[in-house]
UniProtKB/Swiss-Prot annotation:
ATP binds at residues 85, 103-107, 504. The keyword Membrane applies. SUPFAM superfamilies: Helical scaffold and wing domains of SecA, P-loop containing nucleoside triphosphate hydrolases, Pre-protein crosslinking domain of SecA. Its EC number is 7.4.2.8. InterPro entries: Helicase_ATP-bd, Helicase_C-like, P-loop_NTPase, SecA, SecA_CS, SecA_DEAD, SecA_motor_DEAD, SecA_preprotein_X-link_dom. GO terms for biological process: intracellular protein transmembrane transport; protein import; protein targeting; protein transport by the Sec complex. PANTHER family: CHLOROPLAST PROTEIN-TRANSPORTING ATPASE, SECA INNER MEMBRANE COMPONENT OF SEC PROTEIN SECRETION SYSTEM. CDD domains: DEXDc_SecA (cd17928), SF2_C_secA (cd18803). Monomer and homodimer. Part of the essential Sec protein translocation apparatus which comprises SecA, SecYEG and auxiliary proteins SecDF. Other proteins may also be involved. It comes from the Bacteria. It is found in: Cell membrane; Cytoplasm. This is Protein translocase subunit SecA.
Length: 800
């Protein structure tokens, strides 16, 4: 392992050495650019574009273009990128991740590769985690690009399609990750090409790249429509599970007895009924066998009610506001407005909390961030913390993490963790340190991992009469303003995880002399990266700073993975004193090994998500490509329609005429022809079922289809109307079947794990079953297109 790390470190150094040489070239242009007038500097943009047209590559232009962008920054923004920012810019242009510490000027770093890549005219997307940051950066950095002659757009969720189209047509477009993904999905649901808003995906720079490509990687973007659902079923299941008792016996216990009705496996957060629980369900609902096929829906409702009541925690996983259940992002602590837990879990939580149950929705289109961002020609990103996830970035996104040196040395003091026996003793110690530091005026930022913890601490500080600001999912609208003031003398700020990320904390007057910003973590996060982000809020640009984490044996991470070893160690040292504190390297090592295990589990889960989603990705690409072919067509879709109808005829005739003639299913064949292709009169007068051969019948039906097509063309004198009719037929059928297929694939994925018990590989089973279901769907699409086209009545009123 040490050798691998050494190799990676050396590779990093080698890459930086190469970048240093390019940075030398950029700096060699500095005086030349400074000597140019504003008009001459601005004229460089059309000059570069002309050189690209003549065959120069962006790499050829890099030193000069970076120098132009740098000089323009000085004149327009009053900011001149440092050498380390040039290095970061080169890493971004190369499609890598620039790991730059907080306060090192990532936003300014991005201006150079954005300018260079925008010269191609193919569009650059600058991606941020929320609309506040998109809007802020578009306003501040947009003036630089506009001065240099580029067009700049902002894409937000409230825009009309026309406004979005204009934003995407710009050289530089600022947007959130979710809006980009949703626009892509919506573009693949339109009926007319001119309704689309995005151009082909060229180059993206993702700010806070770890947050988007790692933390949110498993979050699918979903566009839904309402599905029918009986809400009473959720209430019935909820009432039943509320009566159940947990089986807390050891999983490895030898006895075969149940000690409760349901069992929870906390490391995987799974919950299931015991045999006693299953029997109780049968008695409660009057069933012989809970797991009979006809009880499938009830089992689903019970499973979700169990999760809602015993796994999902209020004010940690979700909040209830104004009679509505809102999801809390476990990484940022923010409320995720408009998002709902899928597969009926949200409805189950609504039943649990006694609020109005909203309709369950049906997925119409879906994609994960992993697969959306992998479609860009070139992808890059910036963050203060990516090195711990380097393997994942390389394997999944083919991006290297390049650690960019700081402009000034880091002098922040990172103190060892302190461990307490209980939550109460830990929070008491945190408040004591806050009191001590607040008394001398030092600003303090306290990081918590849940809304519950932040409110508990806030209540304790109120009792001590210490004024403070609370930043969590319940008031994130003001978070940027609050976080900007967190470095002022006497400020005390409590933040859930990385609320306010992307906004710098600058130190107020006299704060350096007090030791800079003090950061106190009240719990270790399951990811080292999130802890590092919290530490990184302090000690920016060579400022002094202080960080310390407070832990307790009752913390979630310690309970799940800390193990009895730490507890025994603490018991030996603490003499049953709840206020006893331990500061030991063993504790830090134990915590870090627990974090590594969780990170490993999470990476495996994300990798598995990608493997499963790749099955859907291939299918999605086929369907979207077919849709685009239909939408793109300007003349006639006959060349698409006819093969579909011919394949349907072949399939049906072959199916009903298998084996010996005496076994042919002629009634079924006649039913197919009457229901899908021709009138009864035609069938009775034109087809002789006693003497026909399958091949001759196929040819006869092909001719029938051709005649029908020509009749419809004649009825619709305008070719544009015929094209319109063809598009409506194909797209309506494709979209309906695709929506149902997404739902079926989702259900397949939920159930596929059970096949693992039969010594089968669930992924291979999912791939095989998914492929068969897709083939079946294509066949169903062609069948329905055949019937709809042949049986549709033309009324000559088709218009766009």
């Amino acid at each position: 392992m040490a050798n691998i790390l050494k190799k990676l470190y050396n590779a990093d150094k080698r890459e930086l050495k190469r970048f240093e040489k390019i940075a030398d070239q950029v700096e060699s242009y500095a005086d030349q650019m400074a000597a140019l007038s504003d008009e001459e500097l601005q004229a460089k943009t059309p000059e570069f574009r002309s050189r690209i047209e003549k065959g120069e590559s962006l790499d050829d232009l890099l030193p000069e273009a970076f120098a132009v962008s740098r000089e323009a920054s000085k004149r327009v923004l009053g900011l001149y990128p440092f050498r380390v920012q040039i290095l970061g810019g080169i890493a971004l242009h190369r499609g890598n991740i620039a790991e730059m510490m907080t306060g090192e000027g990532k936003t300014l770093t991005a201006t150079m590769p954005v300018y260079l890549n925008a010269l191609s005219g193919k569009g650059v997307h600058v991606v941020t985690v929320n609309e506040y940051l998109s809007s802020r950066d578009e306003t501040e950095m947009g003036q630089l690009y506009r001065w240099l002659g580029l067009t700049v757009g902002l894409n937000v969720s409230t825009m009309s399609p026309e406004e979005k189209r204009k934003a995407y047509a710009c050289d530089v477009t600022y947007s959130t990750n979710s809006e980009l993904g949703f626009d892509y999905l919506r573009d693949n649901m339109v009926v007319y090409k001119e309704q689309m808003v995005q151009r082909p995906l060229n180059y993206a720079i993702i700010d806070e790249v770890d947050s988007i490509l790692i933390d949110e990687a498993r979050t699918p973007l979903i566009i839904s429509g309402e599905a029918e659902q009986a809400n009473a079923d959720y209430v019935r299941a909820d009432r039943f599970v509320k009566k159940l008792v947990e089986d807390k016996s050891d999983n490895d216990a030898d006895d075969d007895e149940d000690h409760g009705d349901y069992k929870i496996d906390w490391p995987t957060k799974t919950i299931s009924l015991t045999r006693t629980g299953i029997q109780k369900a049968c008695d409660h609902f009057g069933l012989k066998n809970l797991y009979d096929v006809e009880n499938q829906k009830l089992v689903h409702h019970i499973d979700q009610a169990l999760r809602a009541n015993y796994i999902m925690l209020k004010d940690i996983d979700y909040v209830v506001q104004d009679g509505e259940v809102l999801i809390v992002d476990s990484f940022t602590g923010r409320v995720m407005e408009g998002r709902r837990f899928s597969d009926g879990l949200h409805q189950a939580i609504e039943a649990k909390e006694g609020v109005k149950i909203q309709e369950e929705s049906q997925t119409q289109a879906t994609i994960t961030y992993q697969n959306y961002f992998r479609m860009y020609q070139k992808l890059s990103g910036m963050t203060g913390t990516a090195k711990t996830e380097e393997e994942e970035f390389r394997e999944i996104y083919n991006m290297e993490v390049i650690t960019i040196p700081t402009n000034r040395p880091v002098i922040r003091q990172d103190m060892p963790d302190l461990l307490y026996p209980t939550l109460d003793s830990k929070f008491k110690a945190v408040v004591d340190e806050i009191k001590e530091r607040h008394a001398k005026g030092q600003p303090i930022l306290v990081g918590t991992v849940s809304i519950e913890s932040s409110e508990r601490l806030s209540h304790m500080l109120d009792k001590e009469h210490i004024p403070h600001a609370v930043l969590n999912a319940k008031n994130h609208a003001k978070e940027a303003a609050i976080i900007m003031n967190a470095g002022q003398r006497g400020a005390v700020t409590i933040a859930t995880n990385m609320a306010g990320r992307g906004t710098d904390i600058k130190l107020g007057p006299g704060v350096k002399e007090l030791g800079g910003l003090a950061v106190i973590g009240t719990e270790r996060h399951e990811s080292r990266r999130i802890d590092n982000q919290l530490r990184g809020r302090s000690g920016r640009q060579g400022d002094p700073g202080y960080t310390r984490f407070y832990l307790s044996l009752e913390d979630d991470l310690m309970k799940r993975f800390g193990g009895d070893r730490v507890k025994d160690f603490l018991d030996r040292l603490s003499d049953n004193d709840d206020d006893k504190v331990i500061e030991s390297r063993l504790i830090t090592r134990q915590v870090e090994s627990a974090q590594k295990r969780v990170e490993g589990n999470n990476y495996d889960t994300r990798k598995q998500t990608l493997q499963y989603d790749d099955v859907m990705r291939i299918q999605r690409e086929i369907i979207y490509k077919e849709r685009m072919q239909v939408i793109d067509e300007q003349q006639s879709l006959k060349s698409v329609l006819m093969p579909m109808i011919h394949r349907t005829i072949d399939h049906q005739v072959d199916m009903f005429t298998q084996g010996d003639r005496s076994t042919w299913r002629l009634d079924s064949l006649r039913d197919f022809i009457v229901s899908s292709l021709a009138s009864e009169e035609y069938v009775d007068s034109e087809i002789d079922f006693k003497t026909f051969t399958p091949d001759a019948l196929k040819q006869q039906l092909y001719q029938l289809v051709e005649d029908n097509y020509q009749e419809k063309e004649a009825a619709l004198a305008d070719p544009e109307q015929m094209l319109e009719f063809e598009k409506v037929v194909i797209l309506r059928v494709v979209d309906e079947h695709w929506t149902n297929h997404i739902d079926a694939m989702d259900q397949l994925r939920q159930s596929i794990g059970l096949r693992g018990y039969g010594q089968l590989n669930p992924l291979v089973e999912y791939q095989d079953s998914g492929y068969n279901m897709f083939e079946e769907m294509i066949s169903d699409i062609e069948f329905d297109v055949t019937r709809l086209f042949m049986k549709a009545q033309i009324r000559n009123n088709l218009s766009r």
